[in-house]
């Protein structure tokens, strides 16, 4: 029966730590307490109301500020790259942006907008490179998974699927265990079961190909280090005297690779090379070899051939140069021991039924004096000779991997010829090495000088660019000023044209009037109510009409139709012409001028 235990607890309010005055001085609105004396523990709950704290607005980051400014420039129709001023922002209703520009500074906003273009270009380049890398990795993993799943697709529906996180690693471990247990008839049922699991795993990987790129890379790493993983408990129980790590080192150091199988009702033999001696792994079995599935054998052979090709490629790329420096006297001194070793191995093959390999360090060479031993030794293997005349014996697996061994021979011969040619080229190039070093140093100095010149030119170009930008800015300011002045002049011209038109309309009713004065005097002027008695109009002397002391003066005026009062000024005295009509008001008398409309 489940019991419920009462655990004491307390509720703390973090906000009260920073607002102790309000906790002390504000009376709580609600106080609830529940005390039960009969129970061991009690529960107390406090509820208190405090003043709402002031929430400070979040400060906008540079990216947000830049995006808002770019949006404002686009919406306002301003040119791209233009930095809006506080006046422009306020005019368009963005007072918040105007305050931010005022606080952070116009120079900072300008640099922020200017750097946006460069960051966009860098982001595009980075995005393109990431897309290319993703496509390459996805394509490689997809091709690897498709190749490995074509041969295993027929039996995949019979088995359950593993989880996605463990599918690739489980497939690798199952494939390693089935490969290491290939010659064990006692574990044949386990190999078949593991192969079926691999088939279901491969189908799951194909179905989830987009989520398995990392798992495919794990598969590639484990396939290169196949023998580095720990073997299954069944193999450990079989008294395996050699670890997989030693097998990898032996294959990398030795020139030959041996996979020798011999099937018998009682035992299976697996032979692998070692740097110092040949080691045998005898696994006792209690059942016959019952791998009857053709697909299983085909998959194992394909995997075995692939591993042989990989090891041959690694071996051909990292061949030991010490074989080139071997001497004939060492080779001749080991002939006798090699012959006895071949005899012992031949006898062992006849008695026990399995064939040992001849290691590279023993330098076993078929002798003309022992043709029978040579033929018996090479009966179950391939004869391989290197560029130095040192033949090797490589056992051929009984499951049909002779083609892979031929590829190993071809790769080894090509590597030996390339190594010899490289050595000859190196011996020839020793004499010219100082010359090449001198040329290399001179080229490096020239490259450094060119780089320095390039940097100087780039600096000059950047300065010229800045100067051009400044000139463009000043020219744009002058252009705006000129446009403003032109607009003002155009407005003034339009106003004057209106005034001129009005003046023409007002002058359309003027009449031409000729005023004459005859009398004695030297200078005569006329004034009157037509100009407000303010301006005096000089009169010209008419010599044709003057007779003796009687002189005549005349002038031409443009006046509107009506009656005007005029007066003549003769030698500075205001007088009236007695020959014209006059009017008297009080003590003042003036001549009358009448203008009739036509």
UniProtKB/Swiss-Prot annotation:
Region listing for Disordered, in residue ranges: 129-167, 359-392, 414-443
Keyword Transit peptide: yes
GO CC list: chloroplast
UniProt feature coiled coil, ranges: 440-516
UniProt keywords, alphabetically: Chloroplast, Coiled coil, Plastid, Transit peptide
Gene deletion effect: No visible phenotype under normal growth conditions, but leaf chloroplasts exhibit reduced number of starch granules.
Biased composition (Acidic residues): 359-375
Entries under Pfam families matching the protein: AMPK1_CBM
Record localization: Plastid, Chloroplast
Compositionally biased spans, kind Basic and acidic residues: 152-167, 432-443
Transit peptide: 1-47
GO biological process entries: regulation of starch biosynthetic process; starch biosynthetic process
Top-level taxon of origin: Eukaryota
InterPro entries, per database record: AMPK1_CBM, Ig-like_fold, Ig_E-set
Role noted for this protein: Involved in starch granule initiation in leaf chloroplasts.
PANTHER family from the UniProt entry: PROTEIN PTST HOMOLOG 3, CHLOROPLASTIC
Entry text on domains: Contains a C-terminal (513-598) carbohydrate-binding domain (CBM).
Subunit field text: Interacts with PTST2.
Protein name per its UniProtKB record: Protein PTST homolog 3, chloroplastic
Source organism per UniProt: Arabidopsis thaliana (Mouse-ear cress)
Name of the gene: PTST
């Amino acid at each position: 029966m489940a019991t419920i235990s009462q655990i004491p607890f307390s509720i703390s309010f973090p906000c009260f730590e920073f607002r102790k005055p309000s906790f002390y001085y504000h009376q709580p609105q609600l106080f609830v307490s529940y005390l039960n004396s009969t129970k061991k523990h009690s529960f107390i709950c406090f509820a208190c109301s405090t003043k709402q704290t002031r929430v400070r607005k979040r400060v906008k980051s540079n990216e947000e500020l830049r995006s808002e400014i770019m949006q404002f420039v686009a919406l306002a129709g301003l040119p791209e790259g233009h930095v809006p001023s506080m006046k422009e922002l306020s005019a368009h209703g963005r007072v918040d942006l105007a305050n931010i520009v005022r606080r952070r500074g116009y120079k900072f906003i300008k640099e922020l907008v200017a750097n946006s273009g460069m960051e966009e270009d860098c982001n595009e380049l980075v995005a393109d490179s990431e897309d290319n890398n993703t496509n390459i990795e996805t394509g490689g993993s997809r091709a690897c998974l498709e190749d490995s799943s074509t041969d295993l697709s027929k039996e995949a529906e019979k088995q359950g699927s593993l989880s996605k996180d463990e599918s690739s690693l489980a497939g690798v471990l199952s494939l390693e265990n089935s490969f290491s247990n290939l010659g064990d008839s006692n574990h044949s049922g386990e190999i078949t079961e593991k192969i079926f699991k691999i088939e279901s795993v491969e189908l799951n990987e194909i179905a989830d190909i987009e989520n398995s790129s990392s798992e495919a890379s794990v598969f590639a790493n484990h396939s290169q280090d196949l023998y580095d993983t720990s073997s299954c408990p069944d193999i450990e129980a079989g008294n395996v005297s050699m670890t997989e790590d030693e097998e990898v080192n032996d294959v990398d150091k030795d020139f030959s690779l041996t996979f020798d199988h011999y099937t018998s009702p009682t035992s299976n033999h697996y032979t692998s090379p070692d740097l110092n001696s040949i080691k045998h792994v005898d696994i006792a079995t209690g059942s016959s070899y019952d791998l009857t599935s053709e697909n299983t054998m085909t998959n194992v052979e394909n995997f075995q051939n692939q591993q042989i090709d990989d090891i041959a490629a690694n071996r051909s790329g990292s061949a030991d140069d010490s074989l080139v420096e071997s001497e004939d006297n060492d080779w001749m001194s080991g002939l006798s021991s090699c012959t006895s070793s071949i005899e012992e191995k031949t006898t062992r093959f006849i008695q026990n039924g399995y064939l040992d390999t001849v290691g590279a360090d023993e330098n076993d060479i078929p002798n003309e004096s022992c043709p029978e031993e040579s033929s018996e030794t090479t009966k179950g293997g391939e004869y391989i000779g290197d560029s130095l005349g040192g033949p090797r014996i490589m056992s051929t697996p009984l499951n049909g991997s002779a083609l892979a061994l031929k590829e190993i021979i071809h790769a080894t011969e090509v590597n030996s010829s390339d190594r010899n040619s490289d050595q000859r080229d190196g011996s020839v190039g020793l004499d010219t090495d100082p010359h090449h070093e001198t040329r290399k140093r001179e080229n490096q100095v020239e490259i450094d000088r060119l780089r320095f010149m390039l940097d100087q030119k780039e600096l000059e170009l950047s300065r010229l660019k800045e100067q051009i930008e400044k000139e463009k800015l000043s020219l744009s300011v002058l252009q705006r000023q000129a446009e403003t002045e032109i607009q003002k002049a155009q407005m003034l011209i339009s106003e004057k044209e209106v005034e001129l038109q009005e003046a023409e309309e007002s002058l359309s009713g003027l009449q031409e009037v000729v005023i004459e004065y005859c009398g004695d005097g030297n200078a005569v002027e006329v004034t009157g109510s037509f100009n407000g008695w303010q301006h005096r109009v000089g009169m010209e002397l008419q010599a044709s009409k003057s007779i003796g002391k009687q002189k005549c003066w005349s002038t031409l005026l443009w006046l509107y139709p009506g009656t005007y009062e005029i007066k003549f000024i003769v030698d500075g005295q205001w007088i009236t012409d007695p020959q014209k009509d006059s009017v008297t008001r009080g003590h003042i008398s003036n001549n009358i001028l009448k203008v009739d409309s036509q």
